[in-house]
Regions:
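A residue-level marker of the well-folded mature domains of exported/periplasmic proteins
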Residues: 3-277
Length: 277
């Protein structure tokens, strides 16, 4: 079922290109290139922006909010016309938004929100409703386990609005079946490795787990590896969000159960359209 962000050292990982609009510059600070969705989005955004003849500089924050804020400050110093990001943190990214506002520049936030953004006319959010992705997971669980189930919930970054919204959507959908219980919640930080190790520990802690629900596909793919090693892939369902190529292949192979699509290509193309305006 399909319904669905960056690592850096002290130096910027950046690339830029120009095809005719050499005086117009877009800066994009990626959340983390190690997160499958973000890596894919970065590529789509760069291609879609360059296709319009717009110069774009792309950096990788490596999941570090302070690094990302610094990168956006750098874009402003470089006289960028637009700054944009898959913002790392709902509150932690406020300094970057304020810097853009002080410079009179548009701030385009992809996939994730920034607190106070709606109070700035130059703030633009591009992304699908994350609450809907969580809702899709919850609705699937209600259909798959009409008599109830015991599930674990593996989350992403705790103060990232996309994950707050995904949890809200899941919880709302699960109200339809109060017999589906969330045994516990663990932060696996969008990491396949952490998803795997957390699942391994959980298998030792709980006698009965019907499903492990993850807020992104990377964590879910780690869970799949843990269940395969333990011989429990047939008895525990695994749900993700993003619709990554690896997740779709895992579903096709009969491993992951479902994912909710985040359409990176469509969102990137929408961003390029905004840059052009």
């Amino acid at each position: 079922m399909a319904v669905g962000c960056g690592t850096a050292d002290d130096t910027k990982d950046s690339s830029s290109s120009s095809k005719g609009k050499s005086d117009y510059l877009v800066g994009f600070a990626n959340n983390s290139d190690t997160y499958n969705y973000c890596a894919k989005f970065r590529s789509y955004l760069k291609d879609a922006t360059e296709a319009k003849g717009i110069s774009i500089t792309v950096t990788d924050a490596g999941g570090d909010t302070n690094v990302q804020n610094g990168q956006i400050d750098d874009f402003i110093v470089q006289n960028a016309n637009v700054v944009s990001a898959i913002s790392n943190d709902l509150d932690g990214s406020i300094p970057a938004l304020e810097a853009a506002k002080d410079a009179g520049l548009p701030y385009v936030s992809f996939l994730t929100s920034v607190s106070g953004g709606d109070d700035y006319d130059g703030y633009i959010y591009v992304g699908s409703p994350n609450e809907d992705a969580g809702k899709a997971q919850g609705e699937y669980l209600c259909d798959a386990f009409p008599d109830g189930a015991s599930i674990l919930y593996f989350t992403g970054a705790p103060n990232d609005q996309q994950y707050v919204d995904r949890k809200k959507g899941l919880e709302e959908a699960l109200k339809k079946n109060p017999n589906i219980k969330i045994l516990d919640e663990y932060n696996v930080e969008n990491s396949k490795d952490l998803g795997m190790s957390t699942a391994e520990d959980s298998l030792l802690s709980y006698d009965k787990i019907d499903a492990i629900v993850c807020q992104n596909d990377d964590g879910a793919l780690g869970v799949v590896e843990a269940l395969k090693s333990a011989g429990k892939l047939d008895s525990i369902q695994v749900l993700g969000i993003d619709g990554s190529d690896d997740a779709l292949q895992s579903i096709q192979d009969g491993e992951m159960t479902m994912t909710a699509l985040q359409d990176a290509k469509a969102q990137a193309e929408a961003g390029a359209d905004i840059f052009e305006k």
